[in-house]
Amino acid sequence: MSIKLTPLEDKIIVKQAEAQTQTASGLYIPDNAKEKPQQGEVLAVGPGRRDDKGERIPMDVKVGDKVLYSKYGGTEVHYEGEDYLIVGARDILAILG
């Protein structure tokens, strides 16, 4: 999936995974009781922050990575009919897989 958003510095654009709609035992979860997912796919990565010497700090994630991010990290954005999450590199907790 290609998007027309370019993150700045150490920001990362993530497409959130779908919220779970059914429990393991088969019960359906109503929309108002669904937990917000804390994982998704990286769609775009900024160039990284600069250190004290002005050099770029490399990013740990790349486009296509499946990531786990902080529960309250990031900003939800609605752009061209799609929902995205913009998170800082420090809010990424792990790369899945």
UniProtKB/Swiss-Prot annotation:
Subcellular location: Cytoplasm
Any one GO molecular function term: unfolded protein binding
Record key words, sorted: Chaperone, Cytoplasm
InterPro entries cross-referenced by the UniProt entry: Chaperonin_GroES, Chaperonin_GroES_sf, Chaprnonin_Cpn10_CS, GroES-like_sf
GO cellular component labels: cytoplasm
Biological process per Gene Ontology, one example term: chaperone cofactor-dependent protein refolding
Principal localisation: cytoplasm
SUPFAM superfamilies for the chain: GroES-like
Listed HAMAP family: CH10
Subunit relationships: Heptamer of 7 subunits arranged in a ring. Interacts with the chaperonin GroEL.
Family classification: Belongs to the GroES chaperonin family.
Role summary: Together with the chaperonin GroEL, plays an essential role in assisting protein folding. The GroEL-GroES system forms a nano-cage that allows encapsulation of the non-native substrate proteins and provides a physical environment optimized to promote and accelerate protein folding. GroES binds to the apical surface of the GroEL ring, thereby capping the opening of the GroEL channel.
NCBIfam families assigned: PRK00364.1-6, PRK00364.2-2, PRK00364.2-4, PRK00364.2-5
Full protein name: Co-chaperonin GroES
Gene of this entry: groES
